[in-house]
From Swiss-Prot:
Disulfide bonds: none annotated. One of its GO terms (molecular function) is S-adenosyl-L-methionine binding. Methylates the 2'-O-ribose of nucleotides at positions 32 of the tRNA anticodon loop of substrate tRNAs. Plays a role in neurogenesis. Requisite for RNA-mediated gene silencing. May modify position 32 in tRNA(Arg(ACG)), tRNA(Gln(CUG)), tRNA(Gln(UUG)), tRNA(Gln(CUC)), tRNA(Leu(CAA)), tRNA(Leu(CAG)), tRNA(Phe(GAA)), tRNA(Trp(CCA)), tRNA(Val(TAC)), tRNA(Val(CAC)), and tRNA(Val(AAC)). Disruption phenotype: Impairs long-term memory functioning with no apparent effect on short-term memory. RNAi-mediated knockdown impairs small interfering RNA-mediated silencing and leads to derepression of piRNA pathway-mediated transposable element silencing. Simultaneous knockdown of Trm7-34 decreases lifespan. Belongs to the class I-like SAM-binding methyltransferase superfamily. RNA methyltransferase RlmE family. TRM7 subfamily. It comes from the Eukaryota. The active site is at 164 (proton acceptor). One of its GO terms (biological process) is neurogenesis. Transmembrane segments: none annotated. It comes from Drosophila melanogaster (Fruit fly). It is found in: Cytoplasm. This is tRNA (cytidine(32)-2'-O)-methyltransferase. S-adenosyl-L-methionine binds at residues 53, 55, 82, 98, 124. Pfam families: FtsJ.
Length: 302
């Protein structure tokens, strides 16, 4: 946890230190549980982008430590997934892996054993913040899509998915994407989330795959998603995967709608960010190269 003066004045920072949480973000999951009861009756859970482990600590204390017998403890299976290693947590199985790879989803299911899948998937991951709101929102959206795609592989029917989002212009689109797979969808900002922060959390329950949909692990910034969808041989995938990964609305409205004679007015948020960053000498070359890769990928897909 940080040690700035601002942090030290934060009640949740001090409380996290007193109660032994690795980060104040533990209270965000606790508040989500208080509001929605997401941990009730859960025995199998997955924590994506788990490091440093505060959400895994919550799962451990709420699901594992409350068990009274060894048999009850053996039935609880909690898997924490991250590229980085973490200090051990009681009752937590750590898996170092990339959530954008199919092998990670298979490893998670393998650890549950048999035909069992997760009842709950949580993700508090976020990209490095650039300070450019549109860029931060876009990158967080892509991370959320990656988390959603692996959740469709490891969640059992009726399961729950909770993940961080950055609220912005794409929030309504995000709602449409999530409701493809979940009957109940809500956006919640817990009291422990700083008022100045644009973060909130999607709380999705009653997971149900669309008929004919084949779960896939998607990396929106890397994969050719149209080709990926075609390989499944599923007509549903060919319609849904581009929409899920990129917000592709082709064919959903009048093709004449929204046309404008001004090329400047037709620019997307990403194009505005791209032009502004490329013209600004203060941004490091490495950041510009990453942005160019993302921009080229989206132009290729569209």
């Amino acid at each position: 946890m940080g040690k700035t003066s601002k942090d030290k004045r934060d009640i949740y920072y001090r409380q996290a230190k007193d109660e032994g949480w690795r980060a104040r973000s533990a209270f965000k999951l606790l508040h989500v549980d208080e509001a929605y009861g997401i941990l009730n009756g859960v025995q199998r859970a997955v924590d994506l982008c788990a490091a440093p482990g505060s959400w895994s600590q919550v799962l451990s204390r709420k699901l594992y430590d409350t068990c009274e017998t060894d048999d009850e403890k053996s039935a609880v299976k909690i898997i924490a997934v991250d590229l980085q290693a973490m200090a051990p947590i009681r009752g937590i199985l750590q898996l170092q892996g990339d959530i954008t790879k199919q092998s990670t989803a298979e490893a998670i299911i393998g650890h549950f054993g048999g035909n069992e899948k997760a009842q709950l998937v949580v993700c508090d991951g976020a990209p490095d913040v650039t300070g450019v709101h549109e860029m931060d929102e876009y990158m967080q959206h892509q991370l959320l899509v990656a988390a959603l795609s692996i959740a469709t592989c490891v969640l059992e029917t009726g399961g729950t998915f909770v993940a961080k989002i950055f609220k912005g212009n794409a929030t309504s689109l995000l709602s449409s994407q999530m409701q493809i797979f979940f009957k109940k969808f809500d956006i919640y900002k817990p009291p422990s989330s700083r008022p100045s922060s644009i973060e909130a959390f999607v709380v999705c329950s009653d997971f149900c795959l669309p008929e004919g949909y084949i779960p896939q692990v998607i990396n929106p910034a890397r994969d050719d998603i149209r080709l990926l969808a075609q390989k499944t041989g599923s007509e549903v995938n060919r319609r849904l995967v581009p929409f899920i990964a990129c917000g592709d609305l082709n064919g959903l409205s009048d093709p004449e709608e929204g046309k404008t004679s001004s090329s400047d007015e037709s620019k997307s948020n990403l194009e505005y960010v791209y032009d502004a960053v490329m013209d600004d000498a203060s941004y490091p070359l490495e950041f510009k190269e990453i942005l160019k890769q993302v921009y080229d990928e989206q132009r290729h897909i569209i």
